[in-house]
Regions:
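Periplasmic polypeptide-binding modules associated with outer-membrane biogenesis and secretion
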Residues: 1-232, 237, 251-266
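Short conserved beta-strand segments at catalytic cores or DNA/RNA-binding microdomains
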Residues: 239-241
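Short loop/turn motifs that connect adjacent beta-strands in outer-membrane beta-barrel proteins
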Residues: 243-249
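Conserved small/polar residues in nucleotide/adenosyl-binding loops
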Residues: 268-270
Length: 270
């Protein structure tokens, strides 16, 4: 406290001292009372210390972080008076654990409640995925035409089978990045962009939007030639790597000659 015996009592300074005591992190309640006496004002500071910390619990039902890990973080503080400043530093350690494993939407709030037995409960929201929505973009970068969603060539199930991020799973940045790499590996898309939005009907959950720019998957080739067996001939080749929007690869080659006509058709179903 900055107020000392012999100093003038100032309410503003008293308020600052009160806040400083709270800020030390050791107390759950602080109250300053005054008594008038023959030699001046006597200040009585009543404090309620925090309880002895015995256990820290996470309330999340989908917790990635184990109870054992939480105990390991706080074990040196179990059996000592709870200091909220030191406690917050340890919460940051748990947050970094979530982040390092890719759970970047995890949020830890608290302590919500400190009971008299020294058990602290932390409120954890880990960012559960409500839905994964696909939006196809045109060359203009828009996902709608006259207010209606733009339809893509590729079937939705072809895209979603590449995704390990599913409704009901906990959002994981590393898993989603791997999902995007698999989508690029299909050679069906020029660009894949990700955005996140809250689910208004399910607070604490998130909707993932994938904005997809499809690339051209068909090619047509042709030519003229001459051979002893066919004479003058014309060739035509048609290749499509996303037939019927199912990621099927088709290849058709036609050769028209003076003496013969040949063709070759292949279909690869992935």
């Amino acid at each position: 406290m900055s107020i000392k015996p012999g100093s003038i009592v100032d309410n503003q300074i008293l308020k600052q001292d009160l806040n400083a005591i709270y800020a030390s992190g050791w107390f759950s309640g602080v109250k300053i009372n005054s008594q008038n006496g023959p030699l001046g004002v006597r200040l009585i500071v009543n404090v309620i210390p925090n309880p002895i910390l015995k256990k820290v619990e996470l309330n999340s039902t989908n917790s990635i972080v184990s109870d054992q890990y939480v105990d390991d973080v706080f074990k040196n503080y179990y059996g000592t008076t709870l200091n909220l400043n030191e406690f917050q530093n340890k919460i940051e350690t748990i947050k970094k654990r979530y982040e390092s494993e890719g759970y970047s939407l995890a949020r830890i709030k608290g302590p919500d409640r400190i009971n008299e037995n020294g058990i602290v409960t932390l409120n954890v929201t880990e960012g559960v995925v409500s839905d994964v929505q696909l939006r196809f973009l045109g060359t203009d970068g828009e996902s709608s035409i006259d207010g209606e969603p733009r339809k893509g060539k590729t079937k939705d199930w072809v895209i979603k089978r590449e995704l390990k991020t599913q409704p009901g799973s906990i959002f994981n940045r590393k898993i989603l990045e791997a999902d995007i790499r698999r989508l690029y590996a299909t050679s069906l898309f020029d660009d894949v962009k990700v955005s996140l939005g809250p689910d208004s009907s399910n607070p604490g959950r998130v909707i993932i939007f994938l904005d997809l720019s499809e690339q051209r998957t068909g090619s047509l080739t042709g030519g003229l030639g001459y051979s002893n067996s066919s004479g003058i001939f014309a060739s035509l080749g048609l290749q499509e790597t996303n037939a019927l929007g199912r990621a099927w690869s088709t290849n058709l080659n036609l050769n028209f000659g003076e003496y013969s006509t040949t063709y070759n058709l292949s279909l690869i179903h992935i």
